[in-house]
UniProtKB/Swiss-Prot annotation:
Enzyme nomenclature, EC number: 2.1.1.129
UniProt keyword annotation of S-adenosyl-L-methionine present: yes
An example Gene Ontology biological process: inositol metabolic process
Name this protein carries in UniProt: Inositol 4-methyltransferase
Summary of the tissues where the protein is detected: Leaves and roots. The levels found in the leaves are 25 times greater than in the roots.
Reactions catalysed: myo-inositol + S-adenosyl-L-methionine = 1D-4-O-methyl-myo-inositol + S-adenosyl-L-homocysteine + H(+)
EC main group: transferase
Binding site for S-adenosyl-L-methionine: D232
Keyword presence, Zinc: no
Keyword entries, A-Z: Methyltransferase, S-adenosyl-L-methionine, Stress response, Transferase
Any one Pfam family match given in the protein's UniProt record, by short name: Methyltransf_2
Family affiliation: Belongs to the class I-like SAM-binding methyltransferase superfamily. Cation-independent O-methyltransferase family.
Source organism phylogeny: Eukaryota, Viridiplantae, Streptophyta, Embryophyta, Tracheophyta
Active site: H270
Length: 365
């Protein structure tokens, strides 16, 4: 049921199936608007204004324009057009407020806003949104058709090299990439550390492909008996801060991995083809002592896609790996078991879930 008007939005109208389907098609055709508006709201720190204002507080677009330092006299009107879209997606709330000049829309934070605001570095999906919609990443999508018809990874078609090489040539994008990974990691790791008890017997832990070290730093902060090693490409760890109990080591996981009794990998295997994953897991096997384990943190795809949140999340992520990575893909539990069987590891044990990711253990036989 949708409410339509002759100006006052009070007359109910029930959409028939044809109108509902057409409306959905129109929404899909216009879908680019929402993430780009949301990206701007994050980058302009508008979401932070709402998040810090708190539940039940409403702010006018004139106040927001002032707080973000807008010099454009039309900014309040432009912001209203942006924010009403965000309110329609439950990122914000909205109500009419009467004033001397008549009624105006004012906005406040909805619960979803707190997951997208910067949260003073305490975990956010906002930087991941910015990464996925950065101009460097977006260019890949324009090569998808050619990839399907002719081959050639879209990111490499767009930029002449694979993503992980490109980050070493573009300092700005390298920072955007690292921030997207780091802030998503904080959010996921908080939940993971509450739900997963598999670090208690670990003495030396290597985070393979650990980016700037957020994963292992949070693990070591809670499990202080662990010696943590953050292992990634040299240009990646060059951007890494110092953490107590963590050593940053530069290298290539396809060539060697530091010795450890446990290896942690979050969102690493999904970036690579099965052949590449076998090479990575073989290097992990060489690194681990007998009985050592890999702690994998990855999404798990359902067998049949459905119109639900789980399918939307994992299949969207899968298509990101499709265009940006060389053979990258999301996998099922059976897919991970097939990789494990080729590399000498035991059956994959699925332990627990942390937001959109699953924690799995693979033991060296």
């Amino acid at each position: 049921m949708t409410t339509y008007t002759n100006g006052n939005y009070t007359q109910p109208k029930t959409l028939d199936k044809d109108e509902q389907l057409a409306g959905l098609a129109v929404t899909l055709a216009n879908a680019a608007a929402f993430p780009m508006i949301l990206k701007s709201a994050f980058e302009l720190k508008i979401l932070d204004i709402f998040s810090k204002a708190g539940e039940g507080v409403f702010v006018s677009t004139s106040e927001i324009a002032s707080q973000i330092g807008a010099k454009n006299p039309n900014a309040p009107v432009l912001l209203d057009r942006m924010l009403r879209l965000l309110a329609s997606h439950s990122v914000l709330t909205c109500k009419l407020q009467k004033g001397e000049g008549g009624s105006q829309r004012v906005y406040g934070p909805a619960p979803l806003c707190n997951y997208l605001a910067s949260n003073d570095g305490q975990g956010s999906l906002g930087p991941l949104l910015v990464l996925h919609h950065d101009k460097v990443m977006m260019e890949s999508w324009f090569h998808l058709n050619d990839y399907i018809l002719e081959g050639g990874v879209p990111f490499k078609r767009a930029h002449g090299m694979i993503q992980f090489d490109y980050t070493g040539t573009d300092e700005r994008f390298n920072h955007v990439f690292n921030q997207g990974m780091a802030h998503h990691t904080i959010l996921v790791m908080k939940k993971l550390l509450d739900n997963y008890n598999g670090f208690n017997d670990v003495k030396v832990l290597v985070d393979v492909g650990g980016n700037i070290g957020v994963n292992v730093s949070m693990i070591v902060a809670k499990h202080t008996h662990i010696k943590g090693i953050n292992y990634d490409l040299p240009h990646v760890i060059a951007d890494a801060p110092s953490y107590p109990g963590v050593e940053h080591v530069g290298g290539n996981m396809f060539e060697s991995i530091p010795q450890a009794d446990a290896i942690f990998m979050k969102w690493v295997l999904h970036d690579w083809s099965d052949e590449h994953c076998v090479k990575i897991l073989n290097k992990c096997y060489e690194s681990l002592a007998k009985g050592g384990k890999i702690i994998l943190v990855e999404s798990l795809i359902p067998v049949i896609p459905e119109d639900n949140l789980e399918s939307h999340m994992v299949f969207s992520l899968d298509c990101h790996t499709l265009v940006h990575n060389q053979g990258g893909k999301e996998r099922s539990k059976e897919d991970f078991e097939a990789l494990a069987s080729k590399t000498g590891f035991s059956t994959v044990d699925v332990i627990c879930c942390a937001y959109d990711t699953w924690v799995m253990e693979l033991y060296k036989k």
